């Protein structure tokens, strides 16, 4: 696995408006294959505007893909 606590603390250090970070593995299928997708959920403080959340989630997704060396990582919320 990976050091979740350390990664969550780095996310908070990179953006103080992050309120909470969660991690799960999402299992999905297209009915011919099954995939397990590493999924991070970032909960933002209420004052963060939706367009900023979208931009920052994409930025964190790209960062996490590089950090974890896994292009299948997604960030939601």
Where are these regions (language model features)?
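Cytosolic C-terminal regulatory domains/tails of membrane transporters and channels
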Residues: 1-77
